[in-house]
C-alpha cells in the first residue's frame, strides 16, 4: 500500500464511529452489548420498535434477573445446610467406662477432727434458730472429738448469718442469729432460690462484704433455713479442704475394697483391682470400671442383663456428714474412656436397699465443622486452655474458662476445678475476699458477661449412652436374712457391725442389645451440584450459559470501568490545557540595540550608540546558534486537490481504501 493510501485509511478509521469495549460512553457500550449478546432479553430492548414494547422487555428482563438472584441465594443457603443420616449396625461393642462415687465424700471418723469447730458452730446456729438439739446417735459418734473451748465463733464472724425482718429496696432490717440483735443496713439482696421475697420474716441468709470496701456488701437469702445452712456450711467446708493435701484427702476417702463388695462382668467374677481410682473434688474417692489406664478395654459379647456389670456397693450411712450429704446412696456416670467424668452434672443416683438396673443404648454422632456449623474437632482452635488433660468437651471448656477468670479476678483458683499452673486454691488466710469475689465472678458467668459461652464451642464428634432405668426392692424379704449374714461374715475383718439393707446398694448396668446408632451429617449440595443448578437457573430465565456470565462480567465491570476512566481522563486533560492557556501571560520582547545586545558583550566590534554600524562591521557580528534564516514557504498543494469525489463515494472496506 502506498504512503498516501495508509494516511487515507487512518483518516477514515478516525472518522468512523467507535463501538465495542473502546466506545467513548457507557450508553454506546451498553447499546453495542445488547446488539451483540446471546442473551435474548437484552437484545429485544434495543431492536424493539415502540416505547411500550421496549418498556415491556425491560420489565421482563429485570424480573428474570431478580428471579435468578433469588434462586441463586436459595441455592447458596442450601449449599451450607446439611442432611443427617442414621445408620444402625450390629457388632460387639466396647463396654464404656463406669465411674462410681459414694454420695458421702469422706468417712466422718477420718475427717471429724478437721471439721469439729465448724460442726459445733453449725449445731449452735440451728439451736438458736429452731431450738435444734443434737441427736443421741450423733453425740455417741462424736465421742473423742477434740474441740477447743473457745467463746469466739470464727466461722460466724467470717460469714455472719441473719434473719430478714423487712426488705425495702436496698434498706434491710435484719437480726443476728447469735445475738438476736436487730440492725438496719444498706446492702444488695440476691435471692438464691426465689425470684422475689414473699415473706422476709421466714428468710435466712448470710452477708458477704468486700474487705477492701466495707460499704460494698451483699446479702444472699434463701427461702428455707435448710438451704441457707447447707450453703453456709459448704463455703467453710471448701475453705478447709483447700488447705489439705491430695494424699491426705485420698486417705480420708473410701478405699476400693470398702466401697465394692461384690463384682461380676459378662458372667465372670471381678474385684476392686478392676477399678481405677479417680479423686473428685466434691465426691472424694471415686472408682472407674474399664478405664483406659488399665490397657485393653473390655468388650460386651452379648446384650442383656446377664452380660453387663453387676456390683454391690457398701454405702456405710453411719459415716455420713449430716450437713454435707443429706441423701444416702451412690452416684454413677457412664462415659467414654477419653472423657472427664462430670458426675456432679450428669450422674445417676442409686438408692440403698434397692436394685437398680440400667439398660444402655449407644449413639455416636459426627457433625460437620466450618462452614456448616461452629463445632470444633479437637478444641485446638478454641482460645480457652484445657485444664483437665482429657478429650475436649463443651463442659471442660466452660469450667476451664471460669477457672481462668477466677484466677484473674480473685488471684486464686476455686477448689471444685483443676488448678492452673502457678495458681493456688482459695482460702481465708491468704485470700480473705475470695468468697465475695467468687460470687461476683459466678454471677457474671451465669449472665454470660465473661465471654465463656461465646468462646467455647461444641465438639463435632461425641458418644452418648441413652439409659433406661428400672428399680426393684432388694434384697427381698425371704432372702434378706441369709444374704446380709453372708456379706457381714465376708466383710467381718473390715467391719465391726452387722450389715443392714440400708447399708447396701445393688447395681446392674448392661447393653440392651448390641445395636449401635451412628448419626452423621453430609452436605446437602456439593460444588458440582451447586454449579449445575446455577447453570439451570441461568438457562431457564435468561437463556445464557457460563460464557454469557463471563461476558456480562467483562462488559458491565471491566469495560465500563475503563470507559468511565477514559472519560474522566479526557475531561481532566482538556481542563488542564484550558487552564494553562488562560494562565500563560504575554511577555513583551524588548528591543536590544547597541551595548544592550547580548551578542555585543565583550565584543570590540560592537559600536556605541553614537557610532552607527557600517556594512563591513555588521558582517563581523557573531550569529546566534539557535537562529534560523527565514525562507519562503512552499506552496500549499492540498488546496489544488479535488476532495468532493471522496466525500460523495462511500468506502466499504479496507480493500477499497488500498485501491484508492
From Swiss-Prot:
Activity regulation (UniProt): Originally identified and characterized by its inhibition by the diuretic drug amiloride.
Keyword Transmembrane helix: yes
GO molecular function: ligand-gated sodium channel activity
Extracellular compartment segments: 77-537
Localisation per UniProt entry: Apical cell membrane
Transmembrane region(s): 56-76, 538-558
Keywords: Cell membrane, Disulfide bond, Ion channel, Ion transport, Membrane, Sodium, Sodium channel, Sodium transport, Transmembrane, Transmembrane helix, Transport
Parts of the chain on the Cytoplasmic side: 1-55, 559-660
Membrane topology classification: Multi-pass membrane protein
InterPro entries: ENaC, ENaC_chordates, ENaC_CS
Disulfide bond annotation, renumbered to this chain: 101-286, 209-217, 263-270, 375-460, 397-456, 401-452, 410-437, 412-426
Reactions mediated catalytically: Na(+)(in) = Na(+)(out)
Keyword Transport: yes
PROSITE patterns reported in the protein's UniProt record: ASC
UniProt GO BP: multicellular organismal-level water homeostasis; sodium ion homeostasis; sodium ion transmembrane transport
Cellular component GO terms held in the UniProt record: apical plasma membrane; plasma membrane; sodium channel complex
Subunit structure: Component of the heterotrimeric epithelial sodium channel (ENaC) composed of an alpha/SCNN1A, a beta/SCNN1B and a gamma/SCNN1G subunit.
NCBIfam families: ENaC (TIGR00859)
Protein family (similarity comment): Belongs to the amiloride-sensitive sodium channel (TC 1.A.6) family. SCNN1G subfamily.
Primary role: This is one of the three pore-forming subunits of the heterotrimeric epithelial sodium channel (ENaC), a critical regulator of sodium balance and fluid homeostasis. ENaC operates in epithelial tissues, where it mediates the electrodiffusion of sodium ions from extracellular fluid through the apical membrane of cells, with water following osmotically.
Protein name in UniProt: Epithelial sodium channel subunit gamma
Organism the protein comes from: Xenopus laevis (African clawed frog)
The gene coding this protein: scnn1g-a
Amino acid at each position: 500500500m502506498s504512503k498516501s493510501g495508509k494516511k487515507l485509511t487512518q483518516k477514515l478509521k478516525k472518522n468512523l464511529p467507535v463501538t465495542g469495549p473502546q466506545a467513548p460512553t457507557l450508553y454506546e457500550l451498553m447499546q453495542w452489548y445488547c446488539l451483540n449478546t446471546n442473551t435474548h432479553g437484552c437484545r429485544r430492548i434495543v431492536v424493539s420498535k415502540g416505547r411500550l414494547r421496549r418498556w415491556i422487555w425491560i420489565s421482563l428482563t429485570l424480573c428474570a434477573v431478580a428471579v435468578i438472584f433469588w434462586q441463586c441465594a436459595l441455592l447458596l443457603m442450601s449449599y451450607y445446610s446439611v442432611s443427617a443420616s442414621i445408620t444402625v449396625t450390629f457388632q460387639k461393642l466396647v463396654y464404656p467406662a463406669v465411674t462410681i462415687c459414694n454420695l458421702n465424700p469422706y468417712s466422718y471418723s477420718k475427717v471429724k477432727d478437721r471439721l469439729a469447730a465448724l460442726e459445733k458452730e453449725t449445731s449452735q446456729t440451728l439451736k438458736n434458730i429452731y431450738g435444734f438439739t443434737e441427736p443421741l446417735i450423733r453425740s455417741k459418734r462424736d465421742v473423742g472429738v477434740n474441740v477447743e473451748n473457745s467463746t469466739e465463733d470464727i466461722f460466724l464472724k467470717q460469714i455472719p448469718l441473719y434473719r430478714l425482718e423487712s426488705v425495702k429496696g436496698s434498706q434491710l432490717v435484719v437480726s443476728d442469729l447469735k445475738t438476736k440483735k436487730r440492725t438496719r443496713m444498706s446492702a444488695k439482696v440476691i435471692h438464691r432460690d426465689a425470684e422475689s421475697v414473699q415473706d422476709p420474716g421466714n428468710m435466712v441468709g448470710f452477708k458477704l462484704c468486700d474487705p477492701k470496701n466495707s460499704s460494698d456488701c451483699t446479702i444472699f437469702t434463701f427461702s428455707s433455713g435448710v438451704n441457707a445452712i447447707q450453703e453456709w456450711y459448704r463455703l467453710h467446708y471448701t475453705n478447709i479442704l483447700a488447705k489439705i493435701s491430695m494424699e491426705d484427702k485420698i486417705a480420708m476417702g473410701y478405699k476400693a475394697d470398702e466401697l465394692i463388695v461384690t463384682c461380676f462382668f459378662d458372667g465372670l467374677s471381678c474385684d476392686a483391682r478392676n477399678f481405677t481410682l479417680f479423686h473428685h473434688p466434691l465426691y472424694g474417692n471415686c472408682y472407674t470400671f474399664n478405664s483406659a489406664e488399665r490397657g485393653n478395654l473390655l468388650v460386651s459379647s452379648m446384650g442383656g442383663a446377664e452380660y453387663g456389670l453387676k456390683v454391690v456397693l457398701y454405702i456405710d450411712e453411719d459415716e455420713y456428714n449430716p450437713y454435707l450429704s443429706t441423701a444416702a446412696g451412690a452416684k454413677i456416670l457412664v462415659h467414654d474412656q477419653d472423657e472427664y467424668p462430670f458426675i456432679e452434672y450428669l450422674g445417676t443416683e442409686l438408692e440403698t436397699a434397692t436394685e437398680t438396673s440400667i439398660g444402655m443404648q449407644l449413639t455416636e454422632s459426627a457433625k460437620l465443622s466450618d462452614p456448616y456449623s461452629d463445632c470444633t474437632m479437637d478444641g485446638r482452635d478454641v482460645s480457652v486452655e484445657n485444664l483437665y488433660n482429657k478429650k475436649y468437651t463443651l463442659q471442660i471448656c466452660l469450667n476451664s474458662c471460669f477457672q481462668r477468670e477466677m484466677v484473674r479476678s480473685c488471684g486464686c483458683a476455686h477448689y471444685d476445678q483443676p488448678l492452673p499452673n502457678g495458681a493456688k486454691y482459695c482460702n481465708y488466710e491468704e485470700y480473705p475476699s475470695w468468697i465475695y469475689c467468687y460470687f461476683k465472678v459466678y454471677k457474671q458467668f451465669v449472665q454470660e458477661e465473661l465471654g465463656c459461652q461465646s468462646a467455647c464451642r461444641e465438639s463435632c464428634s461425641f458418644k452418648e449412652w441413652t439409659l433406661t432405668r428400672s428399680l426393684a426392692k432388694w434384697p427381698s424379704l425371704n432372702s434378706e436374712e441369709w444374704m446380709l449374714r453372708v456379706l457381714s461374715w465376708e466383710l467381718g475383718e473390715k467391719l465391726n457391725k452387722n450389715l443392714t439393707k440400708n447399708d447396701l446398694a445393688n447395681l446392674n448396668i448392661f447393653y440392651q442389645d448390641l445395636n449401635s446408632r451412628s448419626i452423621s451429617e453430609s452436605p446437602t449440595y456439593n460444588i458440582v451440584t451447586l454449579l449445575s443448578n446455577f447453570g439451570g437457573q441461568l438457562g431457564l430465565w435468561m437463556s445464557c450459559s457460563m460464557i454469557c456470565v463471563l461476558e456480562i462480567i467483562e462488559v458491565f465491570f471491566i469495560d465500563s470501568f475503563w470507559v468511565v476512566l477514559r472519560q474522566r481522563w479526557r475531561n481532566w486533560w482538556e481542563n488542564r490545557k484550558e487552564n494553562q492557556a488562560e494562565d500563560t501571560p504575554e511577555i513583551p520582547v524588548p528591543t536590544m540595540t547597541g551595548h544592550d545586545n547580548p551578542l555585543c558583550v565583550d565584543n570590540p566590534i560592537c559600536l556605541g550608540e553614537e557610532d552607527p554600524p557600517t556594512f563591513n562591521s555588521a558582517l563581523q557580528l557573531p550569529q546566534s546558534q539557535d537562529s534560523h534564516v527565514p525562507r519562503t514557504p512552499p506552496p500549499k498543494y492540498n488546496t489544488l486537490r479535488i476532495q468532493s469525489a471522496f466525500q460523495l463515494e462511500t468506502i466499504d472496506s479496507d480493500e477499497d481504501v488500498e485501491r484508492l
